[in-house]
């Protein structure tokens, strides 16, 4: 079946490169749609969607004004073309005229292309062939929490040469393969899909929970709560991919509050609360703060009990005062939930690092957290305390049983 692949291009500085890419896609039997966001000068040839069209959609009627901005306030020119391109691509998506996106280029092209890609839904094939793909600090911004595939061109995307041609061929092969085999991004599942937050310090609870969910007729999807993973989960919740959450590892709240390595944004828990899906929340990860590789944090927490996992992963114990703030945040965000929710608290420790005899064990601090949470939560939100350690299969079963109860309540409205 013939598919439409959008090529994001700057045809004023790259001509032969995009001509080759377009011809390669068409040789595979697909429609190649060139979107030109040129800002600097006249393009070598016009795109299927011209830079003038992109400029107008961004809010500037005259492309010469964009070119003037590019010379004096380049950021504003770039932002205009990104805005215009996103509007055009959004329409193509709604009209069913878009099946994949390919970007090719250096710094500016990568920024524009990935900004467009970040506006698209999960599952839409997105490939960025970039000379910036080997730059870790930039890639973090280009990809964010989206399912964008980066291909390192190794050499710069400036005029065709044997090495660049190999990478362009590979890029076309990759995006064509994606659109040919992709099941699409509007999949209807026969069973409810449930997000389960996870990390290594709670895996003995998470893995059994996944098994128990399957037994009860759900489709579990583990989400790695390392900051990016829980942000991605929240975005997928807002896109409608999940019908419930078992949030065993809520660590992103504390990491965000205290500036740790695994900060998950200032709206953790709110996606589920505002989307009207049931959620069970447990406190795994709130007992620690990830400070590895951060001299300022290592210094600030030097007097705290610490667990050294490896040279990058150092976990410091959180204090009662910090846990009090976390409890208040969690309570406030659950209080605004439009669907049933519950909290599940283990009494014998919250992670594999938080148990008797280990550095992060502090049952008094954990108990203080629970007392603050209970006082601040709405009385209709249950807090179930269980005489278990969190990192056990038994806790995983408790989490699933509690979730199943509130899920049914949400379904029946009673």
Regions found by a protein language model. Name each.
Residues 4, 13-27, 31-33, 260-414:
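C-terminal non-catalytic interaction/assembly regions of soluble proteins
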Residues 10-16, 99, 103-113, 133, ...:
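Gly/Ser/Thr-rich loops at beta-strand to alpha-helix junctions
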Residues 14-24, 33, 39-49, 189-231, ...:
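Glycine-rich phosphate/diphosphate-binding loop of Rossmann-like nucleotide-binding domains
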Residues 67-73, 136-201, 325, 332, ...:
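Cap/lid and interdomain-hinge subdomains that line or gate substrate/regulatory clefts
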Residues 103-122, 206-209, 355-362:
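Short Gly/Thr/Asp-enriched flexible loops that form oxyanion-binding sites at enzyme active sites
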Residues 100, 112-142, 149-152, 221-225, ...:
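Short, acidic/small-residue loops that bind anionic groups at enzyme active sites
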Residues 46-97:
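Phosphate/nucleotide-donor binding subsite
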Residues 1-43, 100, 109-119, 123-128:
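N-terminal phosphate-binding or glycine-rich loops at protein starts, especially the Walker A/P-loop
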